[in-house]
Amino acid sequence: MLFSTQAEFSMSALVPPFTRESAIQKVRLAEDGWNSRNPERVSRVYTPDSQWRNRAEFVSGREEIVCFLTRKWARELDYRLIKELWAFGDNRIAVRFAYEWHDDSGNWFRSFGNENWEFDKQGLMQQRFACINDLPISADDRKFFWPLGRRPDDHPGLSELGL
C-alpha cells in the first residue's frame, strides 16, 4: 500500500513532459489519492494556487480544495473511484473516470466524467477541469466492491468493466 508521503513524492516526481508510462502512473497515483478520501493529502499534489472547475463549481487554491473535498466526501459515502488515461501531451493529461457512492438515504449512484489536467514544471497540478454526470443505480448494479481505500492492482479498470 502507498503511504501518503510515498504517493505524494511519486506524484510530484513524475514531471512533464509526460510519456505514456509516466502519464499512466500519474493517473493511478491520482486515483489512489482520491480513494484515500483524505482532503489534506489530496490537496498537496496541486499547486498552492491551483484552479479547478468541478461541474459548475469553481475552486481556487489548496484551502478551497480541502473545503470542497471535505464537503464532497461527507455527501458521497463509500466512495470508490477508477480513473483511466484518455490522452496526454507535454504537461497535460486527460482522463475518464467513474466512481460509485451512496447518499445518506442509501441511494446509490455511479458518476461518470472526464478531467483535463495541466501540470507545472514540478509535476503539481495547476489546472483541473471536470465534467461529471450522476447515474442513479441499484445496489445490485454496483461494480466497485473492493474495501475502502486503494483499488487492488488486480481489480479491473473501466475498459475491462465495460464502463
Q: Residue ranges of each PLM-predicted region?
A:
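A beta-strand edge to alpha-helix "cap/lid" segment located at domain peripheries
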Residues: 2-18, 67-163
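Generic recognition of short, well-ordered alpha-helical interface segments
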Residues: 22-25, 60, 64
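Short, well-ordered alpha-helical segments enriched in acidic and aromatic residues
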Residues: 36-49, 53, 117
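A short gly/proline-enriched turn/hairpin at secondary-structure junctions
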Residues: 13-15, 49-60, 72-75
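Short, aromatic-enriched amphipathic alpha-helices that serve as compact interaction elements
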Residues: 19-36
